[in-house]
Structure formats: structure tokens, C-alpha cells
């Protein structure tokens, strides 16, 4: 419950109100793919191609990849 994902944890159990994470075990609840992240929505990975970070300046938007909760940087990141 320290807001860090540590070895053996699938999710951080620091937020008992998180519906995706079992606060007692720090494991994802049955059926959950993720508990947090820019590409996690209602315990599921957002579909590939969903914008997760809007471009700033000369950069380009970043998109979810459909297989993780993180928001990968585009290959042209400035």
C-alpha cells in the first residue's frame, strides 16, 4: 500500500477503493487486466489506437497499444 508496484504485486494495494485490485493480496481481481495506468479503463486495457497522451508542441499524440495499461511514447517523441 505504498503507491509502488513491488516484486510479487500485480497492483498496489494502497487504495482499498480500487475495484480492480484486491487490497488484501495486491493481486488483480478476477477478470481484471489492470488496476491503473493511462491505458486502463474500468479494469481493462483500452483498445489499441486510443489516444492516451495529447501532443505538445512538435510532438505527436501517444496511443494505447491494447496489451498494457501504460501509455507508450511514440517513436518520434521530441
Curated annotation (Swiss-Prot):
Disulfide-linked positions: 11-26, 13-21, 20-43, 34-40, 39-64, 52-71
Residue ranges occupied by any Disintegrin domain in the UniProt entry: 1-78
Main location: secreted
Site (May bind to both beta-3 (ITGB3) and alpha-V (ITGAV) integrin subunits): 77
Site (May bind to metal ioncoordinated at the beta-3 integrin (ITGB3) subunit): 58
GO cellular component: extracellular region
Site (May bind to alpha-V integrin (ITGAV) subunit): 53, 56, 73
Motif Cell attachment site, residue numbers: 56-58
Record's subcellular location: Secreted
One of the record's GO molecular function terms: toxin activity
A Pfam family this chain is assigned to: Disintegrin
Distribution of this protein across tissues and organs: Expressed by the venom gland.
Site location (May bind to beta-3 integrin (ITGB3) subunit): 76
Role this protein plays: This recombinant disintegrin antagonizes integrins alpha-IIb/beta-3 (ITGA2B/ITGB3) and alpha-V/beta-3 (ITGAV/ITGB3). On ITGA2B/ITGB3, it interferes with the outside/-in phosphorylation of the focal adhesion kinase (PTK2 / FAK) downstream of the integrin. It strongly inhibits platelet aggregation induced by ADP, thrombin, and collagen, abolishes and reverses dynamic platelet recruitment to immobilized fibrinogen. In vivo, it induces a dramatic increase in the tail bleeding time, and has a strong antithrombotic activity.
Subunit text: Monomer.
Misc. comment: Is derived from the P-II subfamily of the venom metalloproteinase (M12B) family. The interaction between the disintegrin and the integrin ITGAV/ITGB3 is inhibited by EDTA, indicating a cation sensitive binding.
Protein name: Disintegrin DisBa-01
UniProt organism field: Bothrops alternatus
Amino acid at each position: 500500500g505504498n503507491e509502488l508496484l513491488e516484486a510479487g504485486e500485480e497492483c498496489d494495494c494502497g487504495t482499498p477503493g480500487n475495484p480492480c485490485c484486491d487490497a488484501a493480496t495486491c493481486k488483480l481481481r478476477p477478470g481484471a487486466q489492470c488496476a491503473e495506468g493511462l491505458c486502463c479503463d474500468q479494469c481493462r486495457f483500452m483498445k489499441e489506437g486510443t489516444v492516451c497522451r495529447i501532443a505538445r508542441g512538435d510532438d505527436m499524440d501517444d496511443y494505447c497499444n491494447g496489451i498494457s495499461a501504460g501509455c507508450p511514447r511514440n517513436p518520434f517523441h521530441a
